[in-house]
Amino acid sequence: MMNRKQTVGVRVGSVRIGGGAPIVVQSMTNTDTADVAGTVRQVIDLARAGSELVRITVNNEEAAEAVPRIREELDRQGCNVPLVGDFHFNGHKLLDKYPACAEALGKFRINPGNVGRGSKRDPQFAQMIEFACRYDKPVRIGVNWGSLDQSVLARLLDENARLAEPRPLPEVMREAVITSALESAEKAQGLGLPKDRIVLSCKMSGVQELISVYEALSSRCDHALHLGLTEAGMGSKGIVASTAALSVLLQQGIGDTIRISLTPEPGADRSLEVIVAQEILQTMGLRSFTPMVISCPGCGRTTSDYFQKLAQQIQTHLRHKMPEWRRRYRGVEDMHVAVMGCVVNGPGESKNANIGISLPGTGEQPVAPVFEDGVKTVTLKGDRIAEEFQELVERYIETHYGSRAEA
């Protein structure tokens, strides 16, 4: 197990980031925040999927006015997930005009690159920090390379040009991202915001750039760090890029909260980004969220797609039931279920899982032995193998985790 970098803990409502706390999964809505009903629905969907913080855009007066109503409705429906307000350009004005918005949020996100331009930058940044202090809210100082503070970049470019051997431009840009975050954090502390109210992020869109920036940032501060590619992309590309970047950093003990910034397919479920974040952490052994289904990829021995459908059915069922099971069955998230397609690895993997089934491959007897804790307990046959195995999984959870449930 890797050793986590010790950072200063930051509390966001009931959630703790850093300071040795479990790595927090967060997400962001893509609704118009002024649409209270639509935003509430999506926040609840994300929270139900397992998001522990949900960020919402606060970009205009209508959005700022809606935030307290969103919080009130979430509370009414029993959803206590903290909301993070995402501010760009005009946050100082919105927080000044709508104090109820500030009170309803669990955290503010500030981008130093667009909090103000020229002579307005420092006063507007100071206003945002003063509101955070007034309402006792933590802040994420989130630097994005695509909206980098140009005054910081210009200063570092000038310094670089005076060197006998100037550094390459990409290296200077990476340093500018880090410098912007660290200097902004220092200014925030100078304005009265304690270190235990500050989270930092330095997001890039490239995997190698992100790794390089966070390795340097982590070595130069003990602030809690938020990890994520700023624009991961769509589909498998976005998932692979996020996994590649975050896994390298997490393996080094870097990172206290993560968000997977996937571009969703039109009409697709927004909660995919939550599932990907959870699966990165769970497959790395950093946290457990839902029982893991182990299944083989299939080959010429498994010309039927029966085992693939069963594996998908079981995984979907487990994830759907987890909000209920998490309350009733303590430890169920650590369970392993094997759904294997033939006799080559099927019995072995099934024995190593908490419960597993080895389905018949091509040319094998049409029977499916089931193993529980390494012991063969039953052999399933006929047309109801899928339904019967799902019932066995439910029974296993009830008998093995029911007694652990908290009163």
Swiss-Prot record:
Gene3D superfamilies to which the protein is assigned, alphabetical: Dihydropteroate synthase-like, Sulfite Reductase Hemoprotein, domain 1
UniProt entry tagged with the keyword Oxidoreductase: yes
Cofactor: how and how many bound: Binds 1 [4Fe-4S] cluster.
CC cofactor: [4Fe-4S] cluster
Gene Ontology MF term list: 4 iron, 4 sulfur cluster binding; 4-hydroxy-3-methylbut-2-en-1-yl diphosphate synthase activity (ferredoxin); 4-hydroxy-3-methylbut-2-enyl-diphosphate synthase activity (flavodoxin); iron ion binding
EC code(s) of this entry: 1.17.7.3
Keywords carried by this UniProt record: 4Fe-4S, Iron, Iron-sulfur, Isoprene biosynthesis, Metal-binding, Oxidoreductase
One BP term from GO: terpenoid biosynthetic process
Binding site for [4Fe-4S] cluster: 296, 299, 342, 349
Protein's UniProt keywords contain Metal-binding: yes
Pathway annotation: Isoprenoid biosynthesis; isopentenyl diphosphate biosynthesis via DXP pathway; isopentenyl diphosphate from 1-deoxy-D-xylulose 5-phosphate: step 5/6
Catalytic activity field: (2E)-4-hydroxy-3-methylbut-2-enyl diphosphate + oxidized [flavodoxin] + H2O + 2 H(+) = 2-C-methyl-D-erythritol 2,4-cyclic diphosphate + reduced [flavodoxin]
Family stated for the protein in its record: Belongs to the IspG family.
Function as written in the Swiss-Prot or TrEMBL entry: Converts 2C-methyl-D-erythritol 2,4-cyclodiphosphate (ME-2,4cPP) into 1-hydroxy-2-methyl-2-(E)-butenyl 4-diphosphate.
HAMAP family to which the protein is assigned, alphabetical: IspG (MF_00159)
Stated name of the protein: 4-hydroxy-3-methylbut-2-en-1-yl diphosphate synthase (flavodoxin)
